[in-house]
């Protein structure tokens, strides 16, 4: 072994394996870019993003931890969401939940 070496198993790692997903169309109706991080409660993102918020309640982006999706002004794109896991308690963000889902 070489100091600092990382030995991994063969094959790809599938993110959020076995988790239910929701795909929805999101549009930036604002005049500024909006970036949403991997673990942000999607229901509570910037109000200038137009989508079915109720479908996004308790969900986050299905992307790698520490990454983000950027929405340019006027841009529409499909995103895939997965449930927020753990205790399923939401605090902060835009303070729309502040407790258990």
Curated annotation (Swiss-Prot):
Organism of this sequence: Brucella abortus (strain 2308)
InterPro entries xrefs: Urease_beta-like, Urease_betasu_sf, Urease_subunit
Keyword Hydrolase: yes
GO cellular component: urease complex
Keywords: Cytoplasm, Hydrolase, Virulence
Top-level taxon: Bacteria
Reaction(s) the record says it catalyses: urea + 2 H2O + H(+) = hydrogencarbonate + 2 NH4(+)
The protein's name: Urease subunit beta 1
EC class: hydrolase
Alphabetized Pfam families for the sequence: Urease_beta
Function: Disruption of the ure1 gene cluster suggests that it protects brucellae during their passage through the stomach. The major route of infection in human brucellosis is oral.
EC number(s) given by UniProt: 3.5.1.5
SUPFAM superfamilies: Urease, beta-subunit
Gene Ontology biological process terms from the UniProt entry: urea catabolic process
Location of this chain's protein in the cell: Cytoplasm
Functional pathway: Nitrogen metabolism; urea degradation; CO(2) and NH(3) from urea (urease route): step 1/1
Gene that encodes the chain: ureB1
Family: Belongs to the urease beta subunit family.
UniProt xrefs under NCBIfam families: PRK13203.1, urease_beta
Entry-linked HAMAP family: Urease_beta
